[in-house]
Amino acid sequence: CLVGSEMCIRDSGNYKRIIAFEPNAKNFEKLKLHCKGMANVSLWQLGSYSKNTELIFNNKAGRNSAIADKGIATKVATVDTILCGMAAGYIKADVEGADFETLIGMQKTMESCKPKLNFSAYHRFEDIFRLALYIHSVNPDYKIFLRHHPYIPAWDTNLYCI
């Protein structure tokens, strides 16, 4: 798991290593509690992006914290930088609209080890096409699926790539 959520962490079961990013301080504390006592878990209080930098986050949105004009300065890094050549088997990302930038920042990982991907495709209307086209351009061996989940509220539409 990478860029993990509570459910991803809780349901991981048999894993070699979990690496999770969470830029929001309050959510990061919750993540630490959920992972307490788990082996081989690395938690990073930062966001994922196309480059290593600092961005402004609106943390007032709680679970939906996102890049904004006003807010808190937050460190972000590429997945490739954090993994530093380590293989990844599965990457789940719900990065509130920074999905395309996160994919750019993990290009080497997608090329070298083709991890299974689970990315949100509903934050920006163009993401349904843009994300799939980019993933295919980086590694045409991916099979790409789109699934809409019947949750309430009903906006969870994800790309699954295997």
Where are these regions (language model features)?
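Single conserved hydrophobic/aromatic residue that forms the stacking wall/gate
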Residues: C1-G4, C8-I9
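Conserved SAM-binding motif I beta-strand of class I
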Residues: R17-E22
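Conserved SAM/SAH-binding beta-strand->alpha-helix loop
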Residues: N24, Y49
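Short, conserved active-site loop motifs that form the nucleotide-linked donor/cofactor pocket
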Residues: V41-S42
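Short internal loop-to-helix segment that lines adenine-nucleotide cofactor pockets
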Residues: K51-I56, A61-C113, S137
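A short, conserved beta-to-alpha structural element at the edge of catalytic cores
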Residues: K114-R130
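Binuclear metal-ion centers of metallo-dependent hydrolases, dominated by the metallo-beta-lactamase
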Residues: I128-I162
